[in-house]
């Protein structure tokens, strides 16, 4: 507050994004990537089992859905998913855009975007998900080093339970699972029939067939 409104205030603004949902705060990951946390994205964890690599980028309470999707993918589809916590999609987009602008002005190749740096060592498709519109996740598409599928709450709203709304917008764990399988199908790693069966069995078109993020154990 002092930096924003004090006598020697600076041209900056601090804000807090608050989600209307009670969740357990996960424990701090071992060897936390503090730079990544501050700049917009860090690797949270990778599933212990599975042979097909894939990646889930999630923000806010979407991280819980990503972790639940990670469990389903490992247990039912032999997918070893890495989960990334995105602390700021906008910062990542601004970083990439600033590098592109600097390169244009100098007539040189752009330096590597921070998002690319964080993701380039991970194999498989990438799925980006948040409770906001997909436009938010789409901002970093140029900097994702692989096939990228985005899930978000596009539309005019949906009045129901949190779980029902996430199923309606397809931002819940089950929808993430199918999006990851879709990415793997595009890479030829799984058959199209696997994706179709998963979408059908997980009832992605039924907002009443849902489970809760509260089912996720504290990590």
Regions found by a protein language model. Give the residues of each.
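Thiamine diphosphate
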Residues: 1-219
């Amino acid at each position: 507050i002092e930096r924003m409104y004090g006598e020697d205030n600076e041209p900056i603004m601090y804000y807090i994004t608050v989600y209307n949902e009670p969740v357990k705060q996960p424990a701090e990951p071992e060897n936390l990537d503090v730079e990544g946390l501050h700049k917009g994205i860090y690797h949270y964890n990778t599933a212990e089992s599975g042979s097909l690599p894939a990646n889930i980028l999630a923000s806010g309470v979407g991280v819980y859905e990503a972790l639940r999707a990670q469990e389903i993918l490992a247990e039912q589809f032999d997918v070893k998913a890495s989960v990334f916590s995105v602390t700021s999609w906008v910062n990542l987009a601004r970083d990439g855009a600033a590098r592109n602008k600097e390169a244009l002005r100098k007539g040189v190749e752009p330096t590597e975007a921070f998002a690319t740096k964080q993701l380039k060592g991970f194999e498989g498709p990438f799925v980006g998900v948040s409770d906001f519109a997909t436009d938010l996740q789409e901002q970093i598409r140029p900097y994702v080093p692989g096939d990228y599928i985005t899930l978000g709450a596009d539309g005019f709203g949906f009045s129901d339970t949190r779980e029902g709304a996430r199923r309606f917008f397809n931002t819940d764990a089950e929808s993430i699972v199918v999006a990851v399988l879709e990415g793997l199908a595009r890479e030829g790693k799984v058959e199209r029939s696997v994706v179709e069966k998963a979408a059908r069995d997980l009832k992605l078109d039924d907002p009443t067939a849902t489970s809760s993020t509260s089912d996720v154990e504290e990590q």
